[in-house]
Amino acid sequence: MAVAGPEIERLIQLLARLPGLGPRSARRAALHLIKKREALMVPLASALQVAIDRIQVCKTCGNIDTQSPCTVCTDPRRDPAMIVVVADVADLWALERAKASNGRYHVLGGTLSPLDGVGPQDLTIDALVQRAHAPEVSEIILALNATVDGQTTAHYITDLLQEANVKVTRLAHGVPVGGELDYLDEGTLSAAMRQRTLF
């Protein structure tokens, strides 16, 4: 039984499609938006319309921005010799928040996942290989998740880049800052031991 009109139910259904929002959270979010109509709903609707009209995918790296090439690709302070490969834009944003890289990026659009039907043709791997052959590029950093699909993708890309004149590196895996050994899984501890560095 519907407790609100079809327009409100539609809003709730659309909000429930967002990651992390189930039906109950979507209902609470809809009520909050309706209560804060002028302070929140109207500016949100305006921001969404701007996103629809102006946001696009960068033709160079796959980032999303209001211009293509994006602000990262056109930033002259970035090191053009380094390309950091990430699975998706959220990973790029995480590295940027951490100020972890001064290089340029390449967004694959996911990782290889045979079980989910995601193959090389579904990702931007060919474009990465082309970029890796550019004379100014000297290092490709594989910043992919330490999952089976991430590892598979990293190995596949490494094999493809054998003929490119670039150094291929990957992020270290191991003990997180502030992490306690007792709480880490065996795979993480093993990786940390194998990739240990001088102190």
From Swiss-Prot:
Disulfide bridge partners, by residue number: none
Zinc finger regions, C4-type: 58-73
Keywords: DNA damage, DNA recombination, DNA repair, Metal-binding, Zinc, Zinc-finger
GO molecular function: DNA binding; zinc ion binding
Domain of life per record: Bacteria
Example GO BP: DNA recombination
Domain Toprim positions: 81-176
InterPro entries assigned: DNA_Rcmb_RecR (IPR000093), Rcmb_RecR (IPR023627), Rcmb_RecR_Znf (IPR015967), TOPRIM_dom (IPR006171), TOPRIM_RecR (IPR034137)
Alphabetical list of Pfam families matching this protein: RecR_C, RecR_HhH, RecR_ZnF, Toprim_4
PANTHER family reported for this sequence: RECOMBINATION PROTEIN RECR
Family assignment from sequence similarity: Belongs to the RecR family.
Function: May play a role in DNA repair. It seems to be involved in an RecBC-independent recombinational process of DNA repair. It may act with RecF and RecO.
Protein name: Recombination protein RecR
Organism: Bradyrhizobium sp. (strain ORS 278)
